């Protein structure tokens, strides 16, 4: 318990209310993704920003204090501009020009016009944007792919349990890969599907690594994972 309490004051390990307290020290508040609805039965609690997303914004907080226009400052202010912003990146295609790409939490990640407008307004603030910068807020390019895999299991384990675990691990990997500039690799999919009890994975799709730029994000449009038999 003492060790857990000690970790609770460290940004890398803090979670929940402990992380909220650390964030408050940096003048950063956890975003509300969906407000609570007390009129439902039972009442619907608010959906809050995940710990990992809040932790990242806290790590960027000092970048946000700069008025010189560093990459981290634009990313920090873009991430805090609206609860639907899942990720953002900043590049400079030409001197004095900044392109901020925005990835949405909603759907495939392609942001709607109102979300882009909210980010643009936040970055246009005179305390954020240097006078010499022309800031263009653009939608992230979504690179679609599918996952098609067949699993061979070791004899003994319940195939339904193993398949469910493999799918859960794949879901977690795809969620962590849903970021700008984050490749989805075949080795990553293999590793995710190799749950306890899986002897082999035959991966048909993606046929190659899904490689994306800082302005792109990979999105899985469909997935099919089947058990085809058992092996030694």
Which positions does each model-derived feature cover?
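Carbohydrate-recognition loop of C-type lectin domains
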Residues: 63-182, 231
């Amino acid at each position: 318990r003492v060790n857990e309490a000690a970790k609770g004051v460290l940004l890398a390990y803090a979670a929940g209310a402990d992380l909220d307290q650390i964030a408050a020290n940096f003048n950063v508040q956890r975003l509300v993704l969906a407000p609570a609805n007390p009129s439902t039965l039972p009442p619907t609690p608010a959906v809050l920003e995940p710990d990992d997303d809040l932790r990242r914004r806290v790590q960027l907080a000092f970048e946000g204090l700069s008025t010189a226009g560093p990459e981290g400052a634009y990313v920090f202010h873009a991430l805090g501009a609206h609860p639907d912003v899942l990720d953002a990146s900043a590049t400079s295609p030409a001197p004095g020009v900044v392109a901020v790409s925005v990835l949405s939490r909603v759907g495939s990640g392609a942001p709607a016009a109102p979300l882009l407008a909210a980010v643009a307004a936040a970055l246009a603030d005179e305390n954020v944007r240097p006078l010499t910068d022309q800031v263009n807020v653009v939608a992230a390019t979504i690179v679609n792919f599918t996952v098609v895999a067949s699993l061979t299991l070791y004899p003994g384990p319940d195939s339904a349990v193993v398949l469910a675990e493999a799918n859960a691990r794949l879901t977690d990997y795809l969620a962590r890969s849903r970021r700008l500039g984050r490749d989805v690799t075949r080795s990553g999919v293999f590793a995710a599907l190799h749950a306890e009890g899986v002897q082999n994975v035959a991966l048909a799709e993606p046929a190659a690594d899904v490689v994306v730029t800082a302005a792109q994000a990979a999105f899985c449009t469909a997935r099919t994972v089947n058990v085809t038999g058992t092996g030694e």
